[in-house]
């Protein structure tokens, strides 16, 4: 393999979803793990990061990942158990809102990616991350622009993270009724903003986010109870 591999620090989508992964496997750098997150921009709920290792061969049962950007909720739910079944390894990490506040979103995101890779039962030879460079990994890695549309392992990690977080937000709505978490999943929508103004923030809101902090500064009552903040770095391996 030439010393210049990879030829650029950031690679965009090539001719197919498995092109980059196949090149890494051919050059002896497998297994290849993909890492992605969901919930960076939400003002409530955890940041969820998933890492996933797929085998070198394309599986027809995961063909829908080729259009992962277009997947709706039902298709993601259908793919979720299929990915868990056929992945060589996967790990999902939940960074609670309190830790996001303490660390900041970007630092929490990078730390979550490191934890997700560290939790894999199969040690990857190479890691592909969706858009963000992940320092501190014990193996080579590459940030990929639009990664969930450029590498199957990142697309699979994206589905695992998205479904895991969405399910948690639905459960959070039962613990904190009135905010509409099951619908907007913690993102700042007009309905969420109206609920925040009426009810005040709860323990699952990110107080470092300006729309939440502004309400606290204005003296809006805060609601506690329900789901508690997880310990820093709490993670779970699904399946």
From Swiss-Prot:
Reactions that this protein is recorded to catalyse: Endonucleolytic cleavage to 5'-phosphomonoester
Keywords assigned: Cytoplasm, Endonuclease, Hydrolase, Manganese, Metal-binding, Nuclease
Cofactor(s) required for function per UniProt: Mn(2+); Mg(2+)
Cofactor binding annotation: Manganese or magnesium. Binds 1 divalent metal ion per monomer in the absence of substrate. May bind a second metal ion after substrate binding.
The keyword Lipoprotein is annotated on this UniProt entry: no
Protein name: Ribonuclease HII
Organism name: Mycobacterium sp. (strain JLS)
Enzyme Commission number, as recorded: 3.1.26.4
This protein's encoding gene: rnhB
Alphabetized InterPro entries for the sequence: RNase_HII, RNase_HII/HIII, RNase_HII/HIII_dom, RNaseH-like_sf, RNaseH_sf
Keyword match Ribonucleoprotein: no
Binding site for a divalent metal cation: 36-37, 130
Cellular component terms (Gene Ontology): cytoplasm; ribonuclease H2 complex
């Amino acid at each position: 393999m030439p010393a210049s591999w990879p030829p650029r620090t950031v690679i965009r989508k090539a001719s197919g979803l498995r092109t980059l992964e196949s090149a890494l496997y051919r050059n002896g750098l497998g297994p290849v793990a993909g890492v992605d997150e969901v919930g960076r921009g939400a003002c409530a709920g955890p940041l969820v990061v998933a890492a996933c290792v797929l085998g070198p061969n394309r599986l027809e049962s995961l063909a829908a990942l080729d259009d992962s950007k277009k997947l709706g909720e039902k298709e993601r739910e259908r793919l979720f158990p299929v990915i868990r079944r056929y992945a060589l390894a996967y790990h999902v990490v939940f960074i609670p809102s309190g830790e996001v506040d303490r660390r900041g979103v970007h630092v929490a995101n990078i730390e979550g990616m490191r934890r997700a890779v560290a939790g894999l039962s199969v040690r990857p030879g190479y890691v592909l991350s969706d858009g963000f460079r992940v320092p501190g990994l014990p193996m080579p890695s590459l940030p990929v622009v639009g990664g969930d549309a450029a590498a199957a392992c990142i697309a699979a990690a994206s589905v695992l993270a998205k479904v895991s977080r969405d399910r948690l937000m639905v459960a959070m709505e039962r613990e904190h009724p009135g905010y509409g978490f099951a619908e907007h999943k913690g993102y700042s929508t007009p309905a969420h903003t109206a609920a925040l103004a009426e009810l005040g923030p709860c323990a699952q809101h990110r107080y470092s986010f300006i729309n939440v902090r502004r309400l606290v500064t204005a003296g809006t009552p805060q609601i506690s109870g329900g789901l508690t903040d997880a310990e820093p770095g709490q993670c779970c391996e699904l399946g």
